[in-house]
Each structure stands twice: as structure tokens, then as C-alpha cells.
Amino acid sequence: MVLNPSKYQDTRTWKMTPAMIRARKPFFKGNMLGLTLLLGVTGSVYYYTYHFLHKDNDFADVPIPPIDPQELEALKKEYEAKKKA
């Protein structure tokens, strides 16, 4: 498939013509502002999500009641019995 030459591109080098560059010039700042805003919002969402999900949440503030050694042995035996079955 052969590309049809555009009147806004030089047919030999495929670069934009000066007319096309002049036509795009007024929109450059707005486009860059929009791009910056879009990337900023996207980056902020990813940053917030990453740091929110990677918090150290190891339940350190939950007190663990002490366990009696006899209860611990009974629980170990129960665990081993379930493991074998």
C-alpha cells in the first residue's frame, strides 16, 4: 500500500510544511498543559494507590492474649490430627 502524499507534508522528506507548523503553533501550549494535567492526575492516582496499599498493616495494635502451655499442646495435637486426616 502506497501512502498518498499530503499537502501538509513535504513529499520528499515527509516533514511538516511551514504552513502546518504555523497552523499547529497556537495549540501547542494548550496541548502541553493538557498532557501535563493528564499525566499529573494519573501519576497521583497511581502514587496514592501504591502507598495506600503498601502500608505496614500487621495488626501490631491488636493484643494477643497469653495461652496456657496445656492449651497449646491440645491445639497442636488437634492440628496434627487434622493434618493427617
From Swiss-Prot:
Which stretches are Mitochondrial intermembrane in the membrane topology?
Answer: 50-85
Q: Which UniProt keywords apply?
A: Membrane, Mitochondrion, Mitochondrion inner membrane, Transmembrane, Transmembrane helix
Q: Please provide one cellular component term from the Gene Ontology annotations of this protein.
A: mitochondrial inner membrane
Which parts pass through the membrane?
A: 27-49
InterPro entries from the xrefs?
Answer: Coa3
The principal location of this protein is: mitochondrion
Membrane topology label: Single-pass membrane protein
The Gene Ontology biological process annotation of the record reads:
mitochondrial cytochrome c oxidase assembly; negative regulation of mitochondrial translation; protein stabilization
Please give the superkingdom of this protein's source.
Answer: Eukaryota
Compartments where located: Mitochondrion inner membrane
- Mitochondrial matrix side of membrane: 1-26
The UniProt family comment states: Belongs to the COA3 family.
Biological role: Required for assembly of cytochrome c oxidase (complex IV). With COX14, negatively regulates COX1 translation and is involved in MSS51 association with newly synthesized COX1.
Query: Mind telling me which PANTHER family this protein's record contains?
Result: CYTOCHROME C OXIDASE ASSEMBLY FACTOR 3 HOMOLOG, MITOCHONDRIAL, CYTOCHROME C OXIDASE ASSEMBLY FACTOR 3, MITOCHONDRIAL
Could you describe the subunit structure of this protein? Answer: Component of 250-400 kDa complexes called cytochrome oxidase assembly intermediates or COA complexes composed at least COA3, COX14, COX5A, SHY1 and SSC1. Interacts with COX1 and MSS51.
Other comment: Present with 2530 molecules/cell in log phase SD medium.
- What protein name applies here? Cytochrome c oxidase assembly factor 3, mitochondrial
Q: Say which species the protein is native to.
A: Saccharomyces cerevisiae (strain ATCC 204508 / S288c) (Baker's yeast)
State the gene name recorded for this protein. COA3
